[in-house]
Amino acid sequence: MSTTTDILPDVHTMRDTLQRLAPGTPLRDGLDRIVRGHTGALIVLGDEENVTSICDGGFEFDVTFAATRLRELCKMDGAVVLSSDGERIKRANVQLIPSPSWPTQESGTRHRSAERTALQTGVPVIAVSESQNTITLYVEGKSHILEEPSTLLNRANQALGTMERYRDRLDQVNTRLHMAELHNYATVIDVVSVIQREEMLRRVGETIDTNVLELGREAKQIQIQLTELRGDNDRERGYIIADYLVTDGIPTDETITEALEAVSGLDDKSLMKPSNIARILGLPPTEEALDEPVVPRGYRTLNRVPRVQKFLMDKLVGEFGNLHALTSASVEEISAVDGVGSLWARHITDGLARLT
């Protein structure tokens, strides 16, 4: 059975901290009690030496964390310091004295202190606003306001609707490209359209991931739908790059990753310009070139044949060079490839035949 300590990261991140603050967790219960009580709070999620060095006054103790204890201790003006695993309350009513040289965009005293403490120590800090009844998390140099579960659920459901439309459109362009590949009439714009839709699906899925983290156990149904809509998109993104990235020989994992990161680095407007995707692939980025024919190496199609692993795909692509040569090869020619053998050769040729 895992404990809170088991999931603690070596470096505090927004993602991990949001998971610790999800509805239903003891810490979120304590924060919700503070909000309902209309009192402010300043809570530090860690008692490392760089935290204790900026603590002044208050009192030290070491008691088991409880939501009710946190609520009562936060009635005092000072900050509350928890252990790094959040299991114990270490200090209360302390004044935090971070360096004023740290930049902050906050106006309230409590929030300015929270942001500067998080920046200086690298430890997550929470500020609860007494006047606005909001919970703000500071970590990784960023701030994030925790929202009500009902608000998050509505947003996640809206995003799922968007993702469903993206999935439908991706399936359409994917099918069109698949048929074009098999019948030797694929063009640059066919490839670009699939990459664009795959990236759009990835982005909206990433947004929903954050909602799922914040919702915690209340996101079970959202997670099921997200997994279904996402499908094999991450793997397929890599295979289409492997099929069409212009390189000498077979693309390496490193070059594929670089191309994927370049696509992910485009803003939404730039993503919708086909020339930008073509340029990343190493293809001519002109409008005229978008209708030029392209020939896949065969990774996407081989991925549709059950149980064919990436290392086997590399061997086949390395031997035959492209999908057309591969689909034209006999069982004997495929079985002659090092590491394939007759059983796999028959399985692969039968699988390719069914796809065509």
Swiss-Prot record:
<dbReference type="GO" id="GO:0106408">
    <property type="term" value="F:diadenylate cyclase activity"/>
</dbReference>
<keyword id="KW-0460">Magnesium</keyword>
<dbReference type="InterPro" id="IPR050338">
    <property type="entry name" value="DisA"/>
</dbReference>
<dbReference type="Pfam" id="PF10635">
    <property type="entry name" value="DisA-linker"/>
</dbReference>
<feature type="binding site">
    <location>
        <position position="78"/>
    </location>
    <ligand>
        <name>ATP</name>
    </ligand>
</feature>
<dbReference type="GO" id="GO:0006281">
    <property type="term" value="P:DNA repair"/>
</dbReference>
<keyword id="KW-0547">Nucleotide-binding</keyword>
<dbReference type="GO" id="GO:0003677">
    <property type="term" value="F:DNA binding"/>
</dbReference>
<dbReference type="InterPro" id="IPR036888">
    <property type="entry name" value="DNA_integrity_DisA_N_sf"/>
</dbReference>
<keyword id="KW-0548">Nucleotidyltransferase</keyword>
<dbReference type="InterPro" id="IPR023763">
    <property type="entry name" value="DNA_integrity_scanning_protein"/>
</dbReference>
<keyword id="KW-0234">DNA repair</keyword>
<keyword id="KW-0227">DNA damage</keyword>
<dbReference type="InterPro" id="IPR003390">
    <property type="entry name" value="DNA_integrity_scan_DisA_N"/>
</dbReference>
<protein>
    <recommendedName>
        <fullName>DNA integrity scanning protein DisA</fullName>
        <ecNumber>2.7.7.85</ecNumber>
    </recommendedName>
</protein>
<feature type="binding site">
    <location>
        <position position="96"/>
    </location>
    <ligand>
        <name>ATP</name>
    </ligand>
</feature>
<keyword id="KW-0067">ATP-binding</keyword>
<dbReference type="Pfam" id="PF02457">
    <property type="entry name" value="DAC"/>
</dbReference>
<dbReference type="GO" id="GO:0004016">
    <property type="term" value="F:adenylate cyclase activity"/>
</dbReference>
<feature type="binding site">
    <location>
        <begin position="109"/>
        <end position="113"/>
    </location>
    <ligand>
        <name>ATP</name>
    </ligand>
</feature>
<keyword id="KW-0808">Transferase</keyword>
<comment type="subunit">
    <text>Homooctamer.</text>
</comment>
<dbReference type="InterPro" id="IPR018906">
    <property type="entry name" value="DNA_integrity_scan_DisA_link"/>
</dbReference>
<dbReference type="GO" id="GO:0005524">
    <property type="term" value="F:ATP binding"/>
</dbReference>
<keyword id="KW-0238">DNA-binding</keyword>
<feature type="domain" description="DAC">
    <location>
        <begin position="11"/>
        <end position="149"/>
    </location>
</feature>
<dbReference type="InterPro" id="IPR010994">
    <property type="entry name" value="RuvA_2-like"/>
</dbReference>
<comment type="function">
    <text>Participates in a DNA-damage check-point. DisA forms globular foci that rapidly scan along the chromosomes searching for lesions.</text>
</comment>
<comment type="function">
    <text>Also has diadenylate cyclase activity, catalyzing the condensation of 2 ATP molecules into cyclic di-AMP (c-di-AMP). c-di-AMP likely acts as a signaling molecule that may couple DNA integrity with a cellular process.</text>
</comment>
<comment type="similarity">
    <text>Belongs to the DisA family.</text>
</comment>
<dbReference type="InterPro" id="IPR038331">
    <property type="entry name" value="DisA_sf"/>
</dbReference>
